[in-house]
Amino acid sequence: MTTLSALFRSVSIAAVSLTALLSTAQAKDLTLLNVSYDPTRELYQEIDGIFAKHWQEKTGDKLTIKQSHGGSGSQARSVDNGLDADVVTLALAIDINSIARKSKRINADWETKFPHNSTPFTSTIVFLVRKGNPKGIRDWGDLTKPDVQVITPNPKTSGGARWNYLAAYAWAKAQPGGTEESAKQYLKDLYSHVPVLDSGARGSTLTFVQRQIGDVLLAWENEAFLAQKELGKGQFDIVVPSLSVLAEPPVAIVDKVVDKRGTREVASAYLNFLYTPEAQRIAIKNFYRPTDPSLAEEAGKLFPPLKTVSIADLGGWDAANQKHFADGAIFDQIYLKK
């Protein structure tokens, strides 16, 4: 019996060793490329490491997630022109729609693939001013005072810049007696106070924070908090305007790329992970507003209440883009190049 037991034990050990060997042999080295908009570097650096660890524990596969950042419109054009992103996490739905329509590398129904129209987090637009708010900036109307310089990126290349512009437009239209013409005049006045248009939100932040240009930065809320906390601690204040915009930066799988590379399963798991409580808490930590309603109270301790309009209130992205940002549209009409 002892000999038989020893034999069974040897067979069992061999079986376990073989299973481990097969598991190791089957494990793969995978890479994903996340092409994102400008100020998401810190958010995805933290999320990527945690997701890669979870994926390896689940599958045995070693996963490396690479990031590419820039103005949302520029990033969309890069993917259109052949950059092999497995996923895109951009500032505007219209940028993803552009890829779906032009190169067709993303399926047209991308918005239906993940919750909340494929938007895992939201943000808004606030003002970042220098400590003590020396120019007394409280609302959009203060941005056109004679001695105020405003820093904002170029809406031709930056998704954040389009949110900035639309928030300003919505405020102007909402004023007593506000009309299309008065809103257009306000935008013309506002952009006459902009000394430089950077190509992306992070570039504008560095212009304001490091180059010390301007009195107020129109910024993603997360970028304003980051600047206040890390880029210039004690040097800036955040001002919440009376009306802003609900910024909804969406995500999508780049279907033609993942099917070519065989990464659809891991790409889908990666974007689904963004909706988990773990990733949603990382979003809060990085100053994004979560979409998970169970975290609303937790998020409310950090984020001030704010009245917002949505892109739907402004007619949707197709209409807004055609009206404001297409060649010859309102932005081209009101912006006088320096």
Residue positions per predicted region:
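Short helix-loop capping/hinge motifs at secondary-structure junctions, enriched
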Residues: 132-138, 157, 170-178, 257-265
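N-terminal segment of the mature folded domain
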Residues: 28-157, 300, 335-336
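Sec/Tat signal peptide C-region and signal peptidase I cleavage site
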Residues: 22-27
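Extracellular/periplasmic juxtamembrane helices and adjacent flexible linkers that interface
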Residues: 258-338
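Bacterial N-terminal signal peptides that target proteins for export
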Residues: 1-14
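A bilobed periplasmic-binding-protein/Venus flytrap-type ligand-binding module shared by bacterial periplasmic
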Residues: 124-133, 248-265, 282-286
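Short beta-strand->loop
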Residues: 35-37, 129-131, 149-176, 190-194, ...
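Ligand-binding pocket segment of bilobal, Venus flytrap-like solute-binding proteins
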Residues: 175-242
